[in-house]
Amino acid sequence: MTNIRKTHPLLKIVNSSFVDLPAPSSLSSWWNFGSLLGVCLAVQILTGLFLAMHYTSDTATAFNSVTHICRDVNYGWVLRYLHANGASMFFICLYLHVGRGLYYGSYTYSETWNVGILLLFAVMATAFMGYVLPWGQMSFWGATVITNLLSAIPYIGTDLVQWIWGGFSVDKATLTRFFAFHFLLPFVVAALVMVHLLFLHETGSNNPTGIPSDSDMIPFHPYYTIKDILGFLVMLTALSTLVLFSPDLLGDPDNYTPANPLSTPPHIKPEWYFLFAYAILRSIPNKLGGVLALVLSILILAIVPMLHMSKQRSMMFRPLSQCLFWLLVAVLFTLTWIGGQPVEHPYIIIGQMASILYFLIILVLMPLISIVENRLLSW
């Protein structure tokens, strides 16, 4: 008798995706982050659903409703901090997942890569709108500053900003619509994840060597399910430790002050996972130029496949490219640090240098060094 998992219409899909899926035998722990992101998304949707049962999206009561969740709801503080720090975990896994794709040349699967970029934008939009909901000082001023950037768009900018605000400033209408979109977008993300996996399973997974592994495949279950479960345990342990011992470590103290349109915080900054893009935005004195650089800092990922000049797919056997890759990582850490600093000397010039280096490495140095490595191969 044929196993039900291979014949049942629904189980058949699950089976071909998670059980009998042929996977390369050489996948390292860097391939764990896809499944970890799935767990992060599940945690965020579940905790978010329960938080939404107690939250009110009204400027008069939003801040107090979050306080009520933390003080009066059974384990409300756990839900709230799991959700807030779960977002940080989500972005740590996201950036490591993208970094893995860049290092091992996974971007040559262009459909999977492009859907991944869409996912990155969708998750960033969701996180930004979620940060506005507690209606603290940084929520309010962060929303004001970031939405105001759209006014840099020629001709329609000002009208567009007022349309998004639902008035002449960030107010009740803005908060209500941000809550609506923050609730909706994770389900859009979940749908995009399905498309991402669909495209991935069309081609099969890449592997650390970048060499086709059709002749050396193993079933996903039990080998990689066990490996993924270990990843889940490590990540959930780290998340639990953060939530139970230092829940406010990655947050901003200003967000414990209720939003006040008449008082500007000394340093307006977004959450830590947006600081690198915020530093690039601030490093250009022109408003429109800054906005374009901000968008391009993420959108540049879309042209990475076109800039691939190497005869080898992975960086595993390309030491010069590896040096450049880790320089890029160092530049991103520098930008993240600069994004959290005040706009004064020497931070301004460091931010500008790091921003130039960021675009220079991806657009010029990576393709050039790949061409050099190709020449070295033929020696």
From Swiss-Prot:
<keyword id="KW-0249">Electron transport</keyword>
<dbReference type="Pfam" id="PF00032">
    <property type="entry name" value="Cytochrom_B_C"/>
</dbReference>
<dbReference type="Pfam" id="PF00033">
    <property type="entry name" value="Cytochrome_B"/>
</dbReference>
<feature type="binding site">
    <location>
        <position position="201"/>
    </location>
    <ligand>
        <name>a ubiquinone</name>
    </ligand>
</feature>
<keyword id="KW-0479">Metal-binding</keyword>
<keyword id="KW-0813">Transport</keyword>
<feature type="transmembrane region" description="Helical">
    <location>
        <begin position="178"/>
        <end position="198"/>
    </location>
</feature>
<dbReference type="InterPro" id="IPR016174">
    <property type="entry name" value="Di-haem_cyt_TM"/>
</dbReference>
<keyword id="KW-0679">Respiratory chain</keyword>
<keyword id="KW-0999">Mitochondrion inner membrane</keyword>
<dbReference type="GO" id="GO:0008121">
    <property type="term" value="F:ubiquinol-cytochrome-c reductase activity"/>
</dbReference>
<dbReference type="InterPro" id="IPR005797">
    <property type="entry name" value="Cyt_b/b6_N"/>
</dbReference>
<dbReference type="InterPro" id="IPR048260">
    <property type="entry name" value="Cytochrome_b_C_euk/bac"/>
</dbReference>
<dbReference type="InterPro" id="IPR027387">
    <property type="entry name" value="Cytb/b6-like_sf"/>
</dbReference>
<keyword id="KW-0496">Mitochondrion</keyword>
<feature type="binding site" description="axial binding residue">
    <location>
        <position position="182"/>
    </location>
    <ligand>
        <name>heme b b562</name>
    </ligand>
</feature>
<comment type="function">
    <text>Component of the ubiquinol-cytochrome c reductase complex (complex III or cytochrome b-c1 complex) that is part of the mitochondrial respiratory chain. The b-c1 complex mediates electron transfer from ubiquinol to cytochrome c. Contributes to the generation of a proton gradient across the mitochondrial membrane that is then used for ATP synthesis.</text>
</comment>
<dbReference type="InterPro" id="IPR036150">
    <property type="entry name" value="Cyt_b/b6_C_sf"/>
</dbReference>
<feature type="transmembrane region" description="Helical">
    <location>
        <begin position="113"/>
        <end position="133"/>
    </location>
</feature>
<dbReference type="InterPro" id="IPR030689">
    <property type="entry name" value="Cytochrome_b"/>
</dbReference>
<dbReference type="GO" id="GO:0046872">
    <property type="term" value="F:metal ion binding"/>
</dbReference>
<keyword id="KW-0349">Heme</keyword>
<dbReference type="GO" id="GO:0005743">
    <property type="term" value="C:mitochondrial inner membrane"/>
</dbReference>
<feature type="binding site" description="axial binding residue">
    <location>
        <position position="196"/>
    </location>
    <ligand>
        <name>heme b b566</name>
    </ligand>
</feature>
<dbReference type="InterPro" id="IPR005798">
    <property type="entry name" value="Cyt_b/b6_C"/>
</dbReference>
<feature type="transmembrane region" description="Helical">
    <location>
        <begin position="320"/>
        <end position="340"/>
    </location>
</feature>
<dbReference type="GO" id="GO:0045275">
    <property type="term" value="C:respiratory chain complex III"/>
</dbReference>
<dbReference type="InterPro" id="IPR048259">
    <property type="entry name" value="Cytochrome_b_N_euk/bac"/>
</dbReference>
<feature type="transmembrane region" description="Helical">
    <location>
        <begin position="226"/>
        <end position="246"/>
    </location>
</feature>
<feature type="transmembrane region" description="Helical">
    <location>
        <begin position="288"/>
        <end position="308"/>
    </location>
</feature>
<comment type="similarity">
    <text>Belongs to the cytochrome b family.</text>
</comment>
<feature type="binding site" description="axial binding residue">
    <location>
        <position position="83"/>
    </location>
    <ligand>
        <name>heme b b562</name>
    </ligand>
</feature>
<keyword id="KW-0812">Transmembrane</keyword>
<keyword id="KW-0408">Iron</keyword>
<feature type="transmembrane region" description="Helical">
    <location>
        <begin position="77"/>
        <end position="98"/>
    </location>
</feature>
<feature type="transmembrane region" description="Helical">
    <location>
        <begin position="33"/>
        <end position="53"/>
    </location>
</feature>
<keyword id="KW-0472">Membrane</keyword>
<feature type="transmembrane region" description="Helical">
    <location>
        <begin position="347"/>
        <end position="367"/>
    </location>
</feature>
<keyword id="KW-0830">Ubiquinone</keyword>
<dbReference type="GO" id="GO:0006122">
    <property type="term" value="P:mitochondrial electron transport, ubiquinol to cytochrome c"/>
</dbReference>
<protein>
    <recommendedName>
        <fullName>Cytochrome b</fullName>
    </recommendedName>
</protein>
<keyword id="KW-1133">Transmembrane helix</keyword>
